[in-house]
């Protein structure tokens, strides 16, 4: 006797096969190509219906995990017989789990049984009475969605893609704002160059352009909403004595359009920064408490997702963002970097140069713990208590290394010097002519300078002459020496030749 266990979206179905060796015969499997043949081959022996959609999801997850649920075990116990029967199962893990139950079944699960399941699934509505095709497809679709949600553990508040896109857009906005602000200052600087030195903030600079227009309107313009009183006075004072050129109304219109873009971009950047902060507190509250919103968001964006970052060890988190320097150091066999993106965290910034690496290592270890709690904790907790505790431990370690209490350094506000208006200097015509009193003195100085230059030239000329004479003497000595050597060589050669001739003559005479 052979049974086929079929898991459907409506419940468990146990089908009895007319041929007990169907799983062994390939020809029988190929014959299951019509509904009549399938209905003749399989009859329903038992059916265990799922009570609800939640129950269906639970049972489906049990089958996927290879576990035998109590409902399935009850169904198999009801159908077991005295004789050992064959049970065809689709999942290998589930087959092993059923074997461990000790029921009187020979459980089979291999590649051949897949063809049986393909035929059974195709004609399932005909095999199960009381279930039509439309109802079964609706139940299957609902169960598939439930399984997908369960696997993904989907939550709208936990979507880290929003953080990745937000931090990337924030960086792009910063670049655009800097470019636009620089262009605006250069453009308007032709008309009012002193304004850029007085007002350093780009957004305030753009708002002044929109409010004031040309510098002539500075005295009548109210800038109290944009600037403090002292700086406003300095701007108005500088506008009265500005050295800038005049611009046409068309120029001003275009400059104002650029200033409007800067103000709008700055407002949107602030809105995006607030959005990123709220998203980070929702997705990774403990990491946010430990390293801050921007550093945390950059870590998540660099690794790709919160889960992949949570799976990374502390050593990887420590040097995340410094991969280029790491591989260069490994290639050249130099010291590896001590920190990457964590360098921008406030705790690392508070440490002195020699302790930055140690604090980065401690911070990375605590960040790894916080990340795993944020990403993998079953009970959601947005308080960030673990992050606060970890931060306190890192601060205590930093105090121990630095030997001082951690205190937030107050921001130093520079006092702006007031611009004082001085009377414009009149043109002095006497400055263009040489006064009679100063003329003799100037002429004496000039004559002295001329004498000094003459003496310097004479001394240089004498030195050159001496050097040339010395060189000539040396050359003459060398030439005399070389001539003498040549003469001696010639005489020696002549003597040698004469001697050889004499020897030859004497030899001939002897013969």
Swiss-Prot record:
Protein name, UniProt field: Nucleolar protein 58
GO molecular function: snoRNA binding
Biased composition (Acidic residues): 442-453
Coiled coil stretches, renumbered: 442-511
Species of provenance: Kluyveromyces lactis (strain ATCC 8585 / CBS 2359 / DSM 70799 / NBRC 1267 / NRRL Y-1140 / WM37)
UniProt cross-references to PROSITE patterns, sorted A to Z: NOP
GO BP: rRNA processing
Gene3D superfamilies for the chain: 1.10.287.4070, Nop domain
Homology family: Belongs to the NOP5/NOP56 family.
Pfam families: Nop, NOP5NT
Keywords: Coiled coil, Nucleus, Ribonucleoprotein, Ribosome biogenesis, rRNA processing
Ribonucleoprotein among keywords: yes
Function: Required for pre-18S rRNA processing. May bind microtubules.
Localization: Nucleus, Nucleolus
Chain segments carrying region Disordered: 398-511
Residue ranges annotated for the Nop domain, each copy included: 283-403
UniProt feature, compositional bias: Basic residues: 460-469, 480-511
Basic and acidic residues: bias regions: 398-408
């Amino acid at each position: 006797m052979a049974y086929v266990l079929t898991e459907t979206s409506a419940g468990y179905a146990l089908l009895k096969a007319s041929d007990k060796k169907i799983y062994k015969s390939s020809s029988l499997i190929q014959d299951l190509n019509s509904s009549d043949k399938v209905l003749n081959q399989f009859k329903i022996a038992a059916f265990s219906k799922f009570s609800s959609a939640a129950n269906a999801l639970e049972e489906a997850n049990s089958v996927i995990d290879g576990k035998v649920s109590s409902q399935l075990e009850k169904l198999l116990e009801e159908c077991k017989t005295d004789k050992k029967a064959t049970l065809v199962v689709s999942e290998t893990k589930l087959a092993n789990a059923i074997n461990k139950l000790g029921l009187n079944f020979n459980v089979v699960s291999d590649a051949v049984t897949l063809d049986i399941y393909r035929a059974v699934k195709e004609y399932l509505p005909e095999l199960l009475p009381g279930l039509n095709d439309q109802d079964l497809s609706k139940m299957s679709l609902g169960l598939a969605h439930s399984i997908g949600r369960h696997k993904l553990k989907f939550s709208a508040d936990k979507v880290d893609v929003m953080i990745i896109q937000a931090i990337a857009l924030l960086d792009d906005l910063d670049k655009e704002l800097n470019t636009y602000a620089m262009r605006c200052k250069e453009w308007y600087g032709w008309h009012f160059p002193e304004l850029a030195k007085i007002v350093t903030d780009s957004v305030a600079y753009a708002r002044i352009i929109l409010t004031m227009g040309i510098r002539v309107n500075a005295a009548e313009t109210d800038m109290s909403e944009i600037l403090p009183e002292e700086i406003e006075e300095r701007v108005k004072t500088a506008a009265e004595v500005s050295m800038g050129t005049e611009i046409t109304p068309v120029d001003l219109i275009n400059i104002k359009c650029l200033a409007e873009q800067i103000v709008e971009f700055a407002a949107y950047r602030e809105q995006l920064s607030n959005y990123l902060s709220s998203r980070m507190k929702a997705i990774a509250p403990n990491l946010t408490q430990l390293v801050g919103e921007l550093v945390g968001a950059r870590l998540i964006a660099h690794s790709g997702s919160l889960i992949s970052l949570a799976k990374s060890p502390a050593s990887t988190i420590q040097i995340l963002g410094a991969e280029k320097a790491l591989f260069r150091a490994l290639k050249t066999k130099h010291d590896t970097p001590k920190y990457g993106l964590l360098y921008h965290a406030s705790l690392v910034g508070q440490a002195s140069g020699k302790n930055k690496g140690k604090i980065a290592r401690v911070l990375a270890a605590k960040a790894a713990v916080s990340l795993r709690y944020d990403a993998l904790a079953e009970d959601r907790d947005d308080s960030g208590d673990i992050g606060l505790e970890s931060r306190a431990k890192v601060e205590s370690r930093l105090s121990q290394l630095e030997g001082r209490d951690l205190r937030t350094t107050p921001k130093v506000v520079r006092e702006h010097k007031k611009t004082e208006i001085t009377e414009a200097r009149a043109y002095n015509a006497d400055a263009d002519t040489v006064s009679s009193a100063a003329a003799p003195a100037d002429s004496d100085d000039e004559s002295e300078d001329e004498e000094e230059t003459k003496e310097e030239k004479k001394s240089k000329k004498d030195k050159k002459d001496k050097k040339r004479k010395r060189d000539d003497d040396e050359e003459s000595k060398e030439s005399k020496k070389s001539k003498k050597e040549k003469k001696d060589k010639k005489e020696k050669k002549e003597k040698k030749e004469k001697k050889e001739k004499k020897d030859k003559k004497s030899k001939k005479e002897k013969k």
